[in-house]
Amino acid sequence: MMKELKGAFHSIANNKEMTLMQETAMETVWHEFLHCHSKAWKNGRVSSAVPLMETLNEFYARQTYPQFVAKFGGRGTHHKEIRKNGIGYYNNSVNFQTLLKHFGIGQGVATKKIGKMLGDTYYDDFFNVLHDRIFKNKLSMIDYKEIINRLSKGELYFNDYLKLI
């Protein structure tokens, strides 16, 4: 990945289009930067909260990495591919996007709300705050918990489970 990251900065410096893997490297760095700018943990790392925290951080990173790239003078041209098939937290990311679509929640709306969460909410509280801000009028807390706990499952399993809700 370091080779791709160096290549990304070289492409930006030379005003050239980045490759898909170079953009993926930039999105990965943005994902990690987002951790540095978040409120992080209130009560120390809670292992059960990690999967959802990483899912939301990755979702936001995939949606917004072109703005990060633009700060260096570059342009994200593979945004659609990375949003859909990025390499970080693949099942969680794909399933979360499926969940949003299933309930008619636009990715732009979700991006804004999750971006706000990254800045004002401790990771420990993501589960409840996500429900309150995005899914409260769509899912009971019981169904929401069951769905969130299945985000890491394979796409087919997740899609089949979602049909039951």
Residue map of PLM features:
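Short runs of predominantly hydrophobic/aromatic residues within well-ordered alpha helices
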Residues: 26, 30, 53, 92-96
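Active-site recognition of the HExxH zinc-binding catalytic motif
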Residues: 23-43, 58, 62
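The DNA-recognition helices of helix-turn-helix-type DNA-binding domains
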Residues: 32, 64, 117-121
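Pan-zinc metallopeptidase signature
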Residues: 89-165
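Short pre-active-site segment immediately N-terminal to the catalytic Zn-binding motif
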Residues: 2-29, 43-48
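Post-HExxH zinc-binding segment in Zn-dependent metallohydrolases
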Residues: 46-92
